[in-house]
Amino acid sequence: MMSIQRATQINRQFDYMSIKELWMAKFPLHKPGDCLDMFKNGNYTGLTMECIQRTKASKKNTIFHIKSDFNSTDYDEPPISGFKMFTQHCCQRIDEHFCGALHPVISNIEFEQNQLRTRPQVASEFNLFIPCGIKNLKIESGEDPTWIVGTKFRKCMCLKPVMVAATIIGTPVNKNLITFCSSDYIQVIVNRNREGSCGICMGNTSTYEACGNWTNETWGEEFSLDLKLCYKCTPVAFIFSLMMSTGHKPYVSKRQFEENRRKWERVLNYKICEENLDSHLACANHENVYKSIKKYEFFDSIWVYHLANSSWVRDLTRECIESNPGPNYIQLLNEHSQRYGFIQPTYEIIAVVSDGHHSYQCTCYYKDTKTQSIGPSKKNAKHQAAEQMFRHQCF
């Protein structure tokens, strides 16, 4: 199964990974995707799994199946009907990039096993969704309050600062911190325990209703997939396609999305948050989680944004920890060739003159295809050529 093969690297290291690493594995590193747990009681060799592999979402390499220590019945059980779920992919990148996926927040808290008993898209009591524009959060789940203080931020696709890393002060919250764009997010209402048996975990199937994030919303009308699946085993791309096929459309159209991308690339300044984020917190989070949020502060100064980021980088330098350089495409190409039995890529580097400067041209050969790139150094040219080849052959 292709979705299992894509997660081979994670599944091989599963027994040696910490709980925090297992949670981060649910957020693909190189591009947005959807990581689904492989339950111990699940059937991942049957016809239902084969149908998933034949879909467009699977062929686009956005569906991953990773190992799990749980049975499907061990998952956190939300209400029988009426709980919400995002229909967006997940992404682990923390650098500046235009992305509408859900992102994890790196923090100093220790993870517990129970925090893995949910999907990142589900409004569970184990997940705390933080919209862009928020700087700090105060939570009171017990006697002592807890402050979530953002220490690093990036530019969201709506130009507001969004939290990337945070420090937990006070009582540990033991919740998964996840961020989303408050200007463009899509949710559905999930009704579990409907008639029918899931083709993977044998649980009851689920139906879905449209929320206010959709146009032509039909309150109370339930829609179900032709493929019998529960919400735990259903890729979010299937739910999105289901809603689109029933006449629903997101408020942010594809054309508007591309216009926002061009604006994001053109505008260097950040947008100050001037809207009330209380409604977004209420819509995204579980009812009990929302009630525990007593106070939040949003960015009202770009100077504070730059100061927080510069302080975060300065601390990393003092601790001799380099920032995330991004994916190593040379290594990824080698892994791709070993995984599928192809001859490893070869590189040819020559010295050239480009724009009056001494440069290097690297040619990458892989699978009867070649890519060329020019860079100021041999290393830079080789990485750029490998990146072009990886995006051409592996995506």
From Swiss-Prot:
Residues annotated as domain DRBM: 328-395
Stored SMART domains: DSRM
Superkingdom of source: Viruses
Organism: Rotavirus X (isolate RVX/Human/Bangladesh/NADRV-B219/2002/GXP[X])
Lineage, uppermost ranks: Viruses, Riboviria, Orthornavirae, Duplornaviricota, Resentoviricetes
Disulfide bonds: none
Protein name: Non-structural protein 1
Coiled-coil ranges per UniProt: none
UniProt cross-references to InterPro entries, sorted A to Z: dsRBD_dom
GO molecular function, a single term: RNA binding
Keywords from the UniProt entry: RNA-binding
A family per Pfam: dsrm
Motif Putative autoproteolytic cleavage motif: chain residues: 320-327
